[in-house]
C-alpha cells in the first residue's frame, strides 16, 4: 500500500513540475517597432537590434531573424512571457 502511495506522490510531483515548466516556456518574439528596417543588413545588425530592444523597447534580448512565414531578415525582440531571457 505504501509503495502505491509513493508512486502516486512522485507522479503528482512530476506532473506539477511539468505544468509549471510548460507555463513558463513560451518565448514571445515581436518585430521591433523602433529599429530601422535596414538594421539587419549592417555588419553589426544583431548588436544594434539587441541594443534597440533592450534600451528602447524594454525586451530582454533582440536578434535579426527570419521567422516562419516571413521571407525577410528583420529585427525581433524576444523574451519569455514571464520576463526572463530566451534563445532565438
Curated annotation (Swiss-Prot):
Indicate yes or no for the key word Disulfide bond.
Answer: yes
Q: Which cysteines are joined by disulfide bonds?
A: 27-86, 40-64, 49-75, 53-77
- Major localisation: secreted
Q: GO CC annotation: what is one?
A: extracellular region
Signal peptide coordinates: 1-25
**UniProt record similarity statement:** Belongs to the DEFL family.
Q: This protein is called what? A: Putative defensin-like protein 39
Q: Which organism is it from?
A: Arabidopsis thaliana
Amino acid at each position: 500500500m505504501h509503495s502505491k502511495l509513493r508512486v502516486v506522490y512522485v507522479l503528482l510531483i512530476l506532473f506539477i513540475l511539468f505544468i509549471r515548466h510548460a507555463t513558463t516556456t513560451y518565448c514571445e518574439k515581436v518585430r521591433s517597432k523602433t529599429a530601422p528596417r535596414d538594421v539587419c543588413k549592417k555588419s553589426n545588425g544583431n548588436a544594434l537590434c539587441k541594443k534597440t530592444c533592450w534600451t528602447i523597447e524594454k525586451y530582454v534580448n533582440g536578434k535579426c531573424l527570419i521567422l516562419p512565414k516571413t521571407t525577410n531578415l528583420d529585427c525581433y525582440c524576444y523574451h519569455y512571457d514571464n520576463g526572463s531571457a530566451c534563445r532565438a
